[in-house]
């Protein structure tokens, strides 16, 4: 595995789970046999440990966003009416980087963040270079004309490992996506189990 790939999958290795469902993730195989290289059996996590792990997993999925930004998103979710965990998922999935990734304009969430930073994306006809930009229902996200033939875009469209969720309409011929509705937890095609209720418990301590 190259140095670049190693950095990309450090979150998977840290959590011991393939959180994006990528075929090349190192956790898909045992690197060493049991007991070798000082591996130890992990003890049972405390309630705090379980809650912390749930937070790290959800935060990591969206590109390991900063604790400050993640907590701010949680606090906004808590202020809204309804279930805080469901609100949290809806807010995270309405981020521009999440929608660019979900629409299969790029292969990874990290690529989505870089793609946006470099000015390759329009929202409602205007260039937006803020990863955390919050989309509203009905917003149209488009890959800019000069960027549509980039290798990273052409690669992502062909990925068979994930499908576009039904809360996003995509035309890959035009490279345009429409954010149709705010999803709940059961709508989101996570590759592993996410537990926003435990994240709520973590911040409610």
From Swiss-Prot:
Assembly and binders: Part of the 30S ribosomal subunit. Contacts protein S5. The interaction surface between S4 and S5 is involved in control of translational fidelity.
Protein name as catalogued: Small ribosomal subunit protein uS4
Gene Ontology terms: cellular component: small ribosomal subunit
SMART domains: Ribosomal_S4 (SM01390), S4 (SM00363)
UniProt family annotation: Belongs to the universal ribosomal protein uS4 family.
GO molecular function: rRNA binding; structural constituent of ribosome
Chain positions covered by the region annotation Disordered: 19-45
Job of this protein: One of the primary rRNA binding proteins, it binds directly to 16S rRNA where it nucleates assembly of the body of the 30S subunit. With S5 and S12 plays an important role in translational accuracy.
PROSITE patterns (alphabetical): RIBOSOMAL_S4, S4
UniProt keywords, alphabetically: Ribonucleoprotein, Ribosomal protein, RNA-binding, rRNA-binding
InterPro entries named among the record's database cross-references: Ribosomal_uS4, Ribosomal_uS4_bac-type, Ribosomal_uS4_CS, Ribosomal_uS4_N, S4_RNA-bd, S4_RNA-bd_sf
Lineage summary: Bacteria, Pseudomonadati, Pseudomonadota, Alphaproteobacteria, Hyphomicrobiales
Pfam families xref list: Ribosomal_S4, S4
CDD domains: S4
Native species: Brucella suis biovar 1 (strain 1330)
Superkingdom, taxonomy of origin: Bacteria
Domain S4 RNA-binding: 94-157
A GO biological-process term: ribosomal small subunit biogenesis
């Amino acid at each position: 595995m190259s140095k670049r790939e190693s950095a990309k999958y450090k979150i998977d290795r840290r959590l011991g789970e393939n959180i994006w469902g990528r075929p090349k993730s190192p956790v898909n195989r045992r690197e060493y046999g049991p007991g070798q290289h000082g591996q130890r059996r992990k003890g049972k996590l405390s309630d705090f440990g379980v809650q912390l792990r749930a937070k790290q997993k959800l935060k990591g999925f969206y590109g390991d966003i900063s604790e400050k930004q993640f907590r701010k998103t949680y606090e906004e979710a808590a202020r809204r009416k309804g279930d805080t965990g469901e609100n949290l998922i809806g807010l995270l999935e309405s981020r521009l980087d999440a929608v660019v990734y979900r629409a299969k304009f790029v292969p990874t969430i990290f690529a989505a963040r870089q793609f946006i930073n470099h000015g390759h994306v329009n929202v409602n006809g205007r260039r937006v270079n803020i990863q955390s930009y919050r989309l509203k229902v009905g917003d149209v996200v488009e890959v800019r004309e000069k960027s549509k033939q980039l290798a990273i875009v052409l690669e992502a469209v062909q990925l068979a490992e994930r499908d576009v969720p039904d809360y996003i309409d995509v035309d890959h011929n035009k490279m345009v996506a429409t954010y149709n509705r705010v999803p709940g937890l059961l709508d989101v095609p996570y590759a592993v189990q996410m537990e926003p209720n435990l994240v709520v418990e973590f911040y409610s301590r």
